[in-house]
Amino acid sequence: MTIVQETIKSSTTYKEVDQKRWFVRYLMLGAVGIILAIKLYLLLFIVDFTVGLYSFFTSFLLFNILFISYIKFKDPYIYAKSMYVSNGITYGISKPLVSIIVPVKNEEGNIRNCVQSCINSTYSNKEIIVVNDGSTDDTAAILDEMKKEEPSLNIIHLSESVGKKQAIEAASEIAKGEIFVSMDSDCDMACDAVEKAVKIFNSDRKIGAISGHGRVRGATTGNALLKMQDVYIDASCRILKGMETSFCSVTCCAGSLSFFRREAVMPYMHDWAHDKFLGMENFKFATDRRLTAFILGTKESSGLEDSSKSDDSASNIMHNIPVLAHCKNGLDTRTSSSGSDTKNTNNKLRYAWKIVYSQSIKVNVGVPETFPTLIRQQIRWRKSFIRSLFATGGIYWRRPFYAALLYYLQISLKFLRPLIVLKVLIFLPLSGDLITILLYFSGVLFAGMIYGVDFRLRNPGSSLWLYRPLFTFMTTFVYSWLIIYAAITIKKTAWR
C-alpha cells in the first residue's frame, strides 16, 4: 500500500466545530433559506422591484457561499497530513528547497518581526530573500543588523524603488527553491506555516498555489477598526476562500502569505511584474489578484508550454533593477531559471493548476489603524478589483461552472451596490417607500449577524463577533462609493 493510500483516523474524524455548533450552522443555513423565500415574496408583491431583486440575489449568494464552505470545504492540510501518517506511523516526506521572499519598503516598525518569523520557521530546507525596495527610513539598517545575527539571510538593497512586483521578480531570479513563499513585510507567519504548505504541495502534484489564513495582529487589544477588520479578514479567508477551495479555484492568493509552485508561477513572473493596463506601463495595483489570475488561466493542454520563453524574459530582469548592494549568495551566484530548471519543467505534464486555501496555515496581518489610512487601502483594493475584472474575469469561466456562476454574480452585485444604496438613501425616502428602506436595512443587519455568529462558532469565547455587523454596515454604506472613486482615479498611481 502506498503512502497516498494510507488514511489516518484522526484526519477523517477532524471537526472544525463540535456537534452543537454544527447544529447552529444548520440553523443559520435554514434561516438564510427562509429569508431567501421571504425576499422572493416581498420582491413580487411588496417592496421596490429593483431593490428587492438585488436583495434577493445577495441572499442567494450568501446561502450558496455558506452552504458550500460548510458542507464541501475540506482543509487540504488535513488530507495532506493523512498521506504521511497512518496508525501512528510517520512516513517520509519530500523536503524541497523553499524560497521565502519578502519585499519591503519603509517598514522599520515591522520588518524585524516579519523576518524573524521566517527565521523561526520549523522547516529547515529554506532560503530567505529580503528585497529592500529603496526604503528611506531605518529598514536597511535593521536588515543589515539582522544579517549579522543570521548570516544565511539573503538581503538585496535597491538604490531606488521599483515597486513590489518588480522587487519580487528580482528575488525570484535569485531564488533556487522549488516552492516560492511570498509574504508582505507587515506580516508574520506561524512557525509551522511552511512545513504545512510543503505537505499540501506534496499531497497533490496539480496544486500550483496555496493561500494562508490571516488574522489581524493585535486585534483583541486594538481599536474598533482593528477588531472590525479582523472579523472581516477571518471570514474572507474561511468562508469565501473556503468556498472557492471547494472548486480548487481561489481567486486571490493574498500578499499576506501565499505559496507558489515554481513551475506554476515562473512562466508569468515577468509579465506580471510589468503588467500593462489602460495604456499604463507597470500597472501598480492588482498585485495579488493579477498573479493568481495568471495561474488560474493556465490552459490544461498547454500549461507550461511557454515556460522557457517566459523564463528567458525574466532572466534579464536584474539588468533593469537598480541594485545598490547585495549579500552573500546573492545575485552573482544565482541559478538562472532559464537553465536546467526549464528543461526539467518541459519534461513534466502540462495541466491546469489547482489553487487552494488552508485554514491551518496561519499568518498575522498588519492593517490600517486609522480611518483615513483604511479608506486609502480600500481605494487601492478597489482599483485592484477593477483590474481583476479584465484578468480573473476574462478567464474564470474556464473553472468549474458553479464557481464561475457565483464569481460573476458576486462582482455584478458589487458594481450595482452603489446604485442600490443611492436609491435606498435618496430616492425611496422621496417617494415615501419606507417599507423597502426598513427591510433593506434589516437585510444588511441580518447578513452581518450571520457572519458574526459564524465567527463566534469558530472562535468560542471571543467577543469580536459583535463588530461584524458594524463592519457590514460600513462596507455597505461607506465602501460602496469607493468603487466609483477608484474607477475615476485609476490612473492615479499614488500609493498613500
Question: Each PLM stretch: what is its role?
Answer:
Residues 381-395, 399, 408, 415-418, ...:
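Short hydrophobic alpha-helical module
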Residues 2, 85-397:
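Non-transmembrane catalytic domains and loops of membrane-associated enzymes and transporters
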Residues 15-26, 397-416:
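Loop-to-transmembrane boundary segments
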Residues 88, 315, 488-496:
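Membrane-interface alpha-helices
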Residues 3-113:
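N-proximal low-complexity "stem/linker" segments adjacent to membrane-targeting elements
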Residues 4-8, 317-321, 405, 488-491:
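Short helical patches
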Residues 38-76, 407-493:
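Membrane-embedded multi-pass helical conduit in multi-pass membrane proteins
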